[in-house]
Amino acid sequence: MASSCSRRLLAAALLPWCCAAWALGHLDPPSPPPLVIWHGMGDSCCNPMSMGVIKKMVEKEIPGIYVLSLEIGKNMMEDVENSFFLNVNVQVNMVCQILEKDPKLQQGYNAIGFSQGGQFLRAVAQRCPTPPMMTLISVGGQHQGVFGLPRCPGESSHICDFIRKSLNAGAYSKLVQERLVQAQYWHDPIKESVYRNYSIFLADINQERCVNESYKKNLMALKKFVMVKFFNDSIVDPVDSEWFGFYRSGQAKETIPLQESTLYTEDRLGLKKMDKAGKLVFLAKEGDHLQISKEWFTAHIIPFLK
């Protein structure tokens, strides 16, 4: 029979393990990664019919998640106006500062960009690695730009008529480039050299003029880069841009996929390495621009946010 001294020694040895097991059993489950959302053209952070719905949907499906829907400006009206008229580089810089100062994002975050918000958040990933973006989901984003503005959503059509005329008159003039957001990702495949030299946003983040190794390194740090393409999109021209494809240089009829582009074959942005590593995810959906049901969003997007 064990002596009382032996029993005391055994109890003393087991006590720390018992306490540790008890503590582990009572730890709160880890919080889900926070989410940052950037809306599209003519929309706002908090529109109850668009981004407000998305925010509530995410919060319902992932209890306890922190969702930051970006407002570019002092109020919703200014947010909408800035989606048309505030220099994208200024917007990206503003967002980088917002994210850097938010204590809830410092361990990393996931991001969803809707329409032009997709390429804007990619610029954030490339230019501002702190705090780290983990997964980027681009829903209808135009990563190789657009060459046409066929239709505008909602009540913004009159603004788009003005923008369309300005783009046709001189998309790469200094005045238009600095004052119209859509001009800053306007990509003329017939005038590639003009685009490369005078595009103040897209040509930069797509490494058209030179290779910024920091951009490449920062983008490759993503765990996943998810791109959603809408087969019946009547707003994005060409729709292939939503998967990083575009018109073959020198004409505006035949499109080529990302994998046939110089950006990919020369791996100027790290997309080829990301593709080989399984980090690029290409999702396709029937329907027009940003036509997403709750069921589709829950089945295809929510899993990337957990």
UniProtKB/Swiss-Prot annotation:
Its EC number is 3.1.2.2, 3.1.2.22. GO terms for biological process: adult locomotory behavior; associative learning; brain development; grooming behavior; lipid catabolic process; lysosomal lumen acidification; lysosome organization; macromolecule catabolic process. It is found in: Lysosome; Secreted; Golgi apparatus; Endoplasmic reticulum. SUPFAM superfamilies: alpha/beta-Hydrolases (SSF53474). The active site is at 115, 233, 289. Glycans are attached at residues 197, 212, 232. GO terms for molecular function: long-chain fatty acyl-CoA hydrolase activity; lysophosphatidic acid binding; palmitoyl-(protein) hydrolase activity; phospholipase A2 inhibitor activity; sulfatide binding. This is Palmitoyl-protein thioesterase 1. It comes from Mus musculus. The gene is Ppt1.
